[in-house]
Curated annotation (Swiss-Prot):
Comment field on protein domains: IleRS has two distinct active sites: one for aminoacylation and one for editing. The misactivated valine is translocated from the active site to the editing site, which sterically excludes the correctly activated isoleucine. The single editing site contains two valyl binding pockets, one specific for each substrate (Val-AMP or Val-tRNA(Ile)).
InterPro entries: aa-tRNA-synth_I_CS, aa-tRNA-synth_Ia, Anticodon_Ile_BEm, Ile-tRNA-ligase, Ile-tRNA-ligase_type1, Ile-tRNA_ligase, M/V/L/I-tRNA-synth_anticd-bd, Rossmann-like_a/b/a_fold
Listed cofactors: Zn(2+)
Compartments in which it is found: Cytoplasm
Protein name: Isoleucine--tRNA ligase
Length: 940
């Protein structure tokens, strides 16, 4: 007599592990990819297909990658991989930005030596070696993320040929007359000891001294006459307001708005000139309660009145400037031509003395003023205030917090300083307007990105592209010693230098003897020693690398740029401007910007706050696939939240996907697609339903991928695993899979559907869960490519004309009924009335339209609802204790314990349990299945 029926069941079996062990398995998979040169295999497989090219905005080669780097690279990798699924040849060439100050600072720190105390040739070589070390370190970290790319052939802005092509980009701008050299106030960083471009400035809150300072009139009588004052007064003073006391020493004029009304005001024994609209605010700051107006005139009447400088007693003119506004101050602005953009412009207009008493370290030069010489401008404000106070010129002082420009690298305040620099004239050849027009041809994701960059471009000044650095691409130009003009053959000369740099790198410029290039003219010229802004390096990569290296891009634009939202004024801006200036068109078809990573409270990652989470820590605790899934699950178009709790929720999502995959694989252990597959029209209704559901999900997932909405991809996959599969289909098929005759049509029908589902699911997750999809791929039966990354979307099984026994509307009703039965089952379990749902029989009381449809399915409904018996009765015959459905009108459900006995094999309760010599306590259905008598099913 048989009592143990385990060996008669088709129990699930797979070597695909339940526990992921990502930390171990991912490293093995990475080794496999490396050993077999997976990237080359993919390229060979996709050769000849339509190309998709994502241009990698180069990260800076300095330090470990942070969570923002991880987000960026993972998003790019997801895109490359999903494009491959769509049949594109999508190469990925990673890049690095390798020049500039941060590397110089790290090298100085490493060798414990100041840059000016070491041979610059040796220093550049050390910078190059340091940058290469950083590239190799970051490369390993990016590869650990599961990012597949041409890691053996990345582009580096310090590659000799790239350095030469960056210089050629500069040459082309000179050729097209976009560049000029001039003295102009630009943001200067004391720590960098260099000029900064607009994109290198952050505006942060700074504490400053807000002061009112007086300038005494040189000719009181002349002023009284202008204001038509009959009384005679001396001590007439113009009041100016400023938040930069350190600039007072460089003052060379005071300005008024020609269209404002200015008042002559008597305050005690003193007479002040103040703008009418700002009188009350100014007197309040000066703590003056009583005043008398002696006269009023428009500002234009005050032109070329002279006033005494409050410190050095030189005479400075009052000039006219329409930029003086009503927003703050006294309506009179002090002008230090070398230390402000507007000051410089108005200073040039009135031919003011461009006095520059401050050096590159932000210190006052010797001979500036007694007590100030050698002091730092930001640290000596109290000295300036005391000097003004001693001269009876300081009338108010208050500490204010206001927005002020800071160096994006050092987080230190900058100051405007007029120096000789190289500028990109973005208004030449109508470039600004043309760029705004061209920007509208790019598809921006999110859409508001277009307006953001147009606003930035509309208001930006000319681009200062020169830097006073050692490690960078040189501005390889010769300047005439006398007239300061560039050599007339500059374009040809730069090409000569570029060819030398192509062989020896940027050091070639500093090694070149002038006579090598200039012949007999060499004595008349001097080399420019400035380097190019690193944003010029990276911004020119469309031309310097892609067009030069990828000939196919000569006619075709890059498909996509993808970077953080800070790159609207950075890489996006520089790339677009340079591309339009040189090629006449935009560099790419689409630009996608992602947000910053913040903690669960919305705060940015900061070491000082202590909320930094590094990619390395996440990978070491959870694995790279969890990090990738977190990125994909986030709506990255705004700021992205991360915390331990969020990552644990991501682990739950991963577990759901993995468990679903494992269940599917475990039910395919005896399935050979070539011999066991069933045609769609012969499949059971629920298997047809599963395929239709899979098709519908695939359409949604493909659309979400194409729209770059990866969080919607994840939510669709989770809903599919949890709702379509987990809470409905997979539970229902267990009885059929485990208890039916192994080669029955009903069982093979299910396996055919399962194979289709896992074939689709593994591709859905491949761009996101690259390691897990690689692992799953090995266990799917049937002939296939060696790697999931070589595959494309599963061709959907057409289901439009399927002859299904169950209509769409009936499926919706069945799912609603099942959900309500599940709730009843849970209640009965909580009340300890049952241990298993199979102990129940269900009676459905339905109105005629539902009754007629359900009655056809009656014999198999118990399999759908996971109970032992289901009966269908008319609604009017319902019992009082029947549960009234909340989701279906005129339907009641009665759940009762079934009187039958439990089958030891299928665990269903039935009245046909057999007890004989051969079989003990099992049902006739199971006996038939054991003996190969095929169980007939249509629906479930």
């Amino acid at each position: 007599m048989m009592n143990d029926y385990k060996n008669t069941l088709n129990l699930p079996k797979t070597k695909f592990p339940m526990k992921a062990n990502l930390l171990i398995s991912e490293l093995k998979i990475l080794e496999c990819w490396k050993k077999n040169n997976l990237y080359s295999i993919i390229r060979e497989n996709k050769k000849g297909k339509k190309t998709f090219f994502l241009h990698d905005g180069p990260p800076y080669a300095n330090g470990d990658i942070h969570i923002g780097h991880a987000v960026n690279k993972i998003l790019k990798d997801i895109i490359i991989k999903f494009k491959s699924l769509f049949g594109f040849d999508a190469p990925y060439m990673p890049g690095w930005d390798c020049h500039g100050l941060p590397i110089e600072l790290q090298v100085e720190k490493k060798i414990n030596q100041n840059i000016n105390k070491i041979n610059h040739k040796i220093f550049r070589e050390k910078c190059r070696n340091y940058a290469l070390d950083q590239v190799n370190k970051q490369k390993k970290e990016f590869i650990r993320l599961g990012v597949i790319g041409d890691w053996n052939n990345p582009y580096l802005t310090m590659d000799f040929h790239t350095e030469a092509n960056i210089l050629r980009t500069f040459k082309n701008l000179i050729k097209k007359k976009y560049l000029y050299r001039g003295i102009k106030p630009i943001n200067w960083c004391i720590d960098c000891k260099s000029s900064l471009s607009d994109s290198e400035i952050d505006y942060n809150i700074k504490e400053s001294n807000s002061i009112d300072v007086s300038f005494s009139a040189c000719d009181n009588n002349k002023i009284l006459k202008i204001f038509n004052s009959e009384k005679k007064f001396d001590k007439i003073k113009a009041i100016i307001w400023t938040t930069t006391p350190w600039t007072i020493i460089a003052n060379r004029a005071i300005s008024v708005n020609p269209n404002f009304i200015y008042l002559l005001v008597k305050c005690n024994k003193e007479i002040f000139i103040i703008a009418e609209s700002l009188l009350d605010k100014t007197l309040a700051r000066l703590n003056i309660k009583k005043s008398k107006i002696l006269g009023s005139v428009y500002g234009k009447k005050l032109k070329f009145l002279y006033f005494k400088h409050p410190l050095n007693k030189i005479h400075v003119p009052m000039i006219l400037n329409e930029y003086v506004d009503f927003k703050s101050g006294s309506g009179i602005v002090h002008v230090a031509p070398n230390y402000g953009e507007e000051d410089y412009i108005i200073g040039k207009k009135y031919k003011l003395n461009m006095y520059d008493p401050i050096d590159s370290n932000g210190n006052y030069l010797p001979g500036t003023f007694p007590g100030l010489d050698g002091l730092n401008i930001f640290k000596s404000e109290e000295v300036v205030l005391n000097l003004l106070k001693n001269n009876h010129s300081l009338y108010s002082k208050k500490i204010i917090n206001h927005s002020y420009p800071h160096c994006w690298r050092h987080k230190s305040p900058t100051f405007f300083r007029a120096t000789n620099q190289w500028f990109f004239n973005i208004d030449n050849n109508n470039l600004r307007n043309k760029t705004i027009s061209e920007i509208k041809k790019i598809l921006w994701i999110p859409k508001w990105g277009m307006n953001q960059i147009i606003d930035l471009l509309s208001n930006r000044p000319d681009w200062c592209i020169s830097r006073q650095r050692v490690w960078g691409v040189p501005i390889a130009v010769f300047i005439n010693k006398k007239n300061k003009e560039i050599h007339p053959n500059t374009v040809e000369l730069i090409e000569k230098v570029s060819k030398k740099i192509e062989k020896k790198g940027v050091q070639a410029w500093w090694d070149i003897n002038k006579s090598e290039i200039l012949d007999k003219d060499s004595d008349k010229y001097k080399k420019v020693l400035d380097t190019l802004d690193v944003w010029f390096d990276s911004g020119s990569t469309y031309y310097s690398i892609l067009i030069k290296k990828w000939n196919s891009l000569n006619k075709n634009k890059v498909d996509l740029y993808l970077e953080g939202s800070d790159q609207y004024r950075g890489w996006f801006m520089s790339s677009i401007i340079l591309s339009i200036a040189i090629t006449g068109g935009i560099p790419c078809k689409k630009i996608l910007a992602h947000g910053f990573v913040v903690d669960s409270n919305g705060k940015k990652m900061s070491k000082s706050i202590g909320n930094v989470i590094s990619p390395k820590d996440i990978i070491n605790e959870f694995g790279a696939d969890i990090l990738r899934l977190w990125v994909a699950s986030s709506d990255y178009k705004s700021d992205i939240s991360i915390s331990k709790e969020i990552l644990l929720r991501t682990v739950d999502i991963y577990r759901r996907i993995r468990n679903t995959s494992r269940f599917l694989l475990s039910n395919l252990n005896d399935f050979n697609p070539e011999f066991n597959s069933i045609n769609l029209e012969n499949m059971l209704s629920i298997d047809q339903w599963a395929i239709i559901k899979t098709n519908n999900r695939q359409k949604k997932i493909k659309n979400a991928y194409e729209e770059y909405n990866f969080h919607k991809v994840v939510s669709n996959i989770v809903d599919f695993c949890s709702l379509d599969m987990g809470s409905f289909y997979l539970d229902i098929i267990k009885d059929r899979q485990y208890t039916n005759y192994i080669d029955s049509l009903a069982r093979r029908s299910c396996q055919t559907a399962i194979l289709y589902i896992i074939e689709c699911l593994v591709r859905w997750i491949m761009p996101i869960l690259s390691f897990t999809s690689h692992e799953i791929w090995k266990y799917i039966p049937g002939k296939r490519e060696k790697y999931v990354f070589l595959s494309e979307w599963v061709k959907e099984i057409p289901c439009e004309n399927i002859n299904s026994y169950i209509s769409k509307s009936l499926w919706k009703i069945l799912i609603k009924i099942k959900n309500e039965i599940n709730k009843i089952i849970e209640i009965k379990k909580l009340e300890d009335k049952i241990k298993s749902s199979l102990e129940l029989k269900i009676t459905l009381y339905a109105e005629s339209f539902i009754f007629e449809e359900l009655i056809l399915l009656k014999k198999e409904l118990n399999f759908a609802f996971l109970v032992s018996y289901v009966s269908i009765k008319k609604y009017e015959n319902s019992k009082e204790n029947a549960f009234k459905s909340k989701s279906i009108k005129n339907l009641k459900i009665l759940a009762e314990k079934f009187d039958g006995k439990k089958c030891l094999r299928c665990w269903n309760y039935t009245n046909d349990i057999v007890n004989d010599v051969k079989y003990n306590k099992i049902c006739n259905r199971c006996i038939n299945n054991i003996n190969g008598v095929e169980e007939k099913r249509k629906y479930f």
